[in-house]
Amino acid sequence: MKRIVLLISVAAIALLGSSKVSAQGKYGPDSTECIKYLSYYTEYYKQKNYDAALPKWRQAYKYCPPTSRYSMLSDGTTLIRNLIQKNQNNPVYKEKLVDSLMTLYNQRVEFWPKYATSSLNNMALDMYNYMKDEPAKLLEGLTGVIEQTKSKTRPNIFLFQISTAV
């Protein structure tokens, strides 16, 4: 009898514990901050005021789960690319920004598989644009993208891979 009560208690606790994870909702545990910063950065982004949008986007990225909105990750790639262009003369900072850009692409692939092919193709283009000074790393990245996208790989990515390998 005690074993049955114990088993029922454990099962009830397990169910209650797992329900908290799904109860967070689309915008995560701090949904008000998430929605607020999504709204703020989006307004600046629509106006192409990327300098003003970037700090608000960073806050949205901090408070929102990657699954809250696809545009948060895709807009983030545009904002980071803009920042990379402005910091061409600072190689250390540029390298960190490129790493952040690749992280955003990986999150897009992981959390939004519907858009994985286009995300991977865009990732390969940005790899080619920003990693030319690291040919081994570039070749490895391009090869990885081609292996994942297979027949849906953009033709120019094959050319980039060949030119990098030579």
Feature-to-residue mapping (PLM):
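TPR alpha-solenoid repeat register
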Residues: Y70, S119, R154-F158
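N-terminal leader/linker segments that initiate helical-solenoid repeat arrays
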Residues: V21-D99, K114-S118
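Bacterial Sec-dependent N-terminal signal peptides
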Residues: M1-D30, T77
